[in-house]
């Protein structure tokens, strides 16, 4: 169980491995968290990474216009050299997904994964 330095353990330490993709399935997520992560990747990657974010609780709670527009804005912004691709999508049909998974991969093959209660917020 990870109790301390959760962001460092899940989002940054795996960058030292041979990975180039991060798949995030989160019940809840915010553009603020995604923006924070993008900014904090500065000089931390060995090669550009691809980030795929799937927000799961939208069928249950919906998504506010401001949050949706925040994700759109981030996807339209110019990406830093540390990020090759950024995708954000929502589950919109029931059942909602409350899982929180962080999967690091190399060219589509899983390398390391974390599951737990930490949303991407």
Predicted regions and their residues:
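PLD/PLD-like phosphodiesterase catalytic module centered on the HKD motif
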Residues: 1-121
């Amino acid at each position: 169980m990870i109790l301390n330095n959760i962001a460092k353990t899940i989002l940054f330490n795996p960058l030292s491995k041979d990975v180039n993709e991060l798949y995030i399935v989160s019940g809840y997520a915010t553009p603020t968290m995604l923006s924070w992560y993008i900014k904090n990747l500065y000089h931390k990657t060995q090669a550009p990474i691809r980030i795929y974010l799937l927000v799961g609780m939208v069928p249950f709670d919906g998504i506010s216009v401001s949050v949706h527009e925040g994700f759109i804005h981030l996807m339209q912004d110019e990406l830093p050299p540390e990020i090759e691709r950024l995708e954000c999508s929502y589950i919109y049909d029931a059942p909602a997904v409350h899982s929180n998974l962080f999967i690091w991969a190399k060219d589509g093959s899983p390398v390391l994964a974390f599951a737990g209660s930490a949303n991407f917020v």
